[in-house]
């Protein structure tokens, strides 16, 4: 999406508002997944709502990126941990001084967009720099996570995530909505669904009658 972290996004957004008097609506970036259906038809899908259901007969591929990180060697350990969490594959390591190491990594674009740069800055105390370029398309191990409020699907909350993060993200989104949605006159159930089942669920208690 062109921004190196949330701070960069906020700075550019504020400048556009102040200097050009623009009213901006900021939305999450989307990724084009390549879906090949059982009948041989191939299409690129951006909207999570159009993503295949769990168990559907379809082959899914996603874009990967080639990432280059320059950082002090002292932060290699924390960076390796971060890369593992973001499905990064280190393909080359080069040390060109006592103070700088270059890592070349391949990783899914969706993981780069999952706040990777901000987390990298935190892991390296701000010393790391990052650049990336598009690489290729690869088979994707992903699922669609849906959110239901009071038994109704809310398409705006649907997202495509790595299968290994399904349970964690399901719990996080349910807890977040539970903390911000207002109470009603009736009990409101919040559910996160993926892998063909309800992964996480919480209920907002009803308002007490006077």
Identify the residue ranges that each predicted region occupies.
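Accessory interaction regions appended to the cores of large information-processing enzymes
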Residues: 1-210
């Amino acid at each position: 999406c062109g921004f190196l972290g949330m701070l960069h996004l906020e700075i550019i957004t504020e400048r556009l508002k102040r200097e050009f008097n623009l009213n901006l609506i900021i939305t999450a970036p989307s990724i084009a997944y390549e879906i090949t259906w059982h009948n041989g038809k191939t299409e690129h899908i951006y909207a999570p709502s159009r993503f295949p259901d769990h168990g559907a007969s379809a082959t899914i591929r996603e874009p990967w990126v080639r990432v280059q990180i320059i950082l002090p060697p002292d932060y290699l350990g924390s960076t390796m941990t971060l890369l593992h969490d973001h499905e990064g594959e280190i393909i080359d390591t080069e040390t060109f001084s006592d103070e700088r190491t270059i890592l070349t990594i391949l990783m899914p674009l969706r993981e780069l967009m999952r706040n990777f740069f901000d987390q990298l800055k935190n892991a390296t105390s701000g010393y790391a720099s990052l650049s990336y370029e598009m690489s290729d398309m690869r088979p994707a191990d992903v699922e669609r996570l849906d959110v239901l409020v009071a038994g109704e699907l809310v398409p705006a909350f649907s997202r495509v995530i790595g299968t290994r993060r399904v349970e964690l993200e399901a719990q996080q989104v349910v807890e977040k909505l539970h903390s911000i949605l207002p109470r009603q006159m009736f009990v409101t159930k919040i559910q996160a669904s993926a892998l063909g089942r309800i992964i996480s669920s919480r209920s907002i208690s009803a308002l007490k009658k006077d």
